[in-house]
UniProtKB/Swiss-Prot annotation:
Positions of ATP binding: S11, F12, H19, G90, L91, R92, E100, Y125, S126, F127, I128, S129, S130, S131
Organism: Staphylococcus carnosus (strain TM300)
NCBIfam families documented for this protein: coaD_prev_kdtB, cyt_tran_rel
Catalytic activity: (R)-4'-phosphopantetheine + ATP + H(+) = 3'-dephospho-CoA + diphosphate
Protein's UniProt name: Phosphopantetheine adenylyltransferase
Documented EC number(s): 2.7.7.3
Signal peptide, first to last residue: none
Quaternary assembly: Homohexamer.
Pfam family, one: CTP_transf_like
Disulfide linkage: none
């Protein structure tokens, strides 16, 4: 039997419990998970790509089949590089789907061997986004139920306690 590999792409600026929910569930279904940290040219990052990677690595340290990578380029090229045929995209709400469908269609056109699977974030996390967490953190509110501990600490340092 061949080893199953999946890619979970995102900017992860920063990683949240919504992301962790998807990662943990995917890790139970695939042999290898490759988290691909992408630089979003449309967004100014709060954390550098290297900082985001470190926060993800600290957050997924207990999940043995997860690797964290940085990649600048086409996602389907990254999939080829790691030998993955599956991209996993998390959806919080139906409103996420239209954008995701356009990405999926383009990826399929670029590499017909790569499939995209969608997973709904668990209801407990469906309202969490990196942007909202950062906004709340700027006002010194408690974000411990939205992000892993290393991220909470990093956001407090970034925005002052």
């Amino acid at each position: 039997m061949t080893e199953s590999k999946a890619v979970i792409p995102g900017s992860f600026d920063p990683i949240t419990y919504g992301h962790m929910d998807i990662i943990e569930r995917v890790a139970q279904r695939f042999d290898e998970i490759h988290i691909c940290v992408l630089k979003n040219s449309n967004k100014e990052g709060t954390f550098t790509v290297e900082e985001r990677m470190a926060l993800i690595e600290a957050s997924v340290a207990d999940i043995p089949n997860v690797e964290v990578h940085q990649f600048n380029g086409l996602l389907v090229d990254f999939c080829d590089e790691v030998g993955a045929k599956t991209i996993i995209r998390g959806l919080r709400a139906v409103s996420d789907f239209e954008y995701e469908l356009r990405l999926t269609s383009m990826n399929k056109k670029l590499n017909s061997d790569v499939e995209t699977l969608y997973m709904m974030t668990s209801t407990n996390y469906s309202f969490i986004s990196s942007s909202v967490v950062k906004e709340v953190a700027q006002y010194k509110a408690d974000i411990s139920e939205f992000v892993p501990e290393p991220v909470e600490k990093a956001l407090k340092e970034k925005f002052g306690k």
